Regions:
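Sec-dependent N-terminal signal peptides
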Residues: 1-15
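Secreted/extracellular ectodomain signature
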Residues: 13-202
Length: 202
């Protein structure tokens, strides 16, 4: 006697706003930056799905994704529990998009399973940018030894660069943009461009 067991899993979109996390209007990081938002360094888990993850994805979720709860983060899954995730992006929207693109390597359709948000998070408005904890540490605590000719550049995807010791503001700005651009995510052909922009130091 042969018995075949078939497990069917259906992922459905949430019915209410509270089920999908903060609603986002796409606000690209653009210059000039009018306000830089930074938050306390510890993030908060925001699980958007009640699905129980199997052992493999659950281990990745708990030990890799949630390690140190670094915002902005997103964890996306396929219907067969393939997954992709990112932490340390500079915006929630970028984290969601990158996690989806990473997940799509495992299957044709992905949904965001969970996010890591900063405490007190509010969606960005035009002219605002937000920073992940590591970049925020440099922004909030510039070393006086860096002098006046210093610059910082960031990308929504989490890339950033801080440079100092240049002969002029324009040289520092060009160096920061060039260095930051070396770390921008460029291996997802369907991911929108997230170029580096200059951030005014305090």
């Amino acid at each position: 006697m042969i018995v075949d067991f078939v497990l069917t899993l259906s992922l459905t979109l949430p019915n209410s706003v509270s089920d999908v996390g903060p609603l986002l209007t796409q606000i690209d990081f653009v210059e000039p930056v009018q306000q830089v938002l930074t938050y306390p360094p510890a993030g908060v888990e925001n699980r958007l799905s009640g699905l129980q993850l199997p052992d493999g994805p659950l281990t990745a979720y708990e030990t890799d994704f949630l390690a140190d709860t670094v915002f902005f983060g997103a964890f996306a899954i396929t219907k067969d529990f393939g997954y992709g995730f990112v932490t340390g992006a500079n915006s929630l929207e970028a984290a969601r998009e990158i996690a989806i693109e990473e997940c799509l390597k495992q299957g044709p359709i992905c949904l965001v399973y969970a996010e890591i948000l900063p405490q007190g998070y509010a969606p960005l408005e035009i002219g605002q940018i937000s920073l992940a904890p590591e970049a925020a540490g440099y922004y909030n605590n510039p070393d006086p030894a860096w002098g006046n000719f210093r610059a910082m550049a960031v990308s929504e995807d989490g890339a950033y660069s801080v440079v100092w010791g240049y002969g002029s503001p324009s040289e520092a700005s060009a160096a920061a943009l060039s260095d930051c651009g070396e770390f921008v995510i460029d291996d997802f052909p369907n991911l929108r461009e997230m170029p580096c922009i200059l951030v005014p130091f305090k």
